């Protein structure tokens, strides 16, 4: 799964595009002998694969992510029967904007089923 994979670098290069990701830990649990954390992630820039590549580059790959995961995260994913990346939006918030998509300006949409499922696993 190396096709269409991005790389995170720490020094500026000519063709590099900067990214900014903010995250905070919501809760932590132990599963399959590993410490797993639920994160709230906010994209300041929105690049393809940004969350997956950034978290993996700092040693915290997303469970089930065959493209950016490491050996340990993939072993944990297998033990927990997680066949796909455990990454989902619980809400989408649109910035203030005008024009064609102005009707979405400042609106937030919450996906309650995902939110409830994640909290049933991580927040007790």
For each feature predicted by the language model, list its residue ranges:
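RNA pseudouridine synthases
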Residues: 1-124
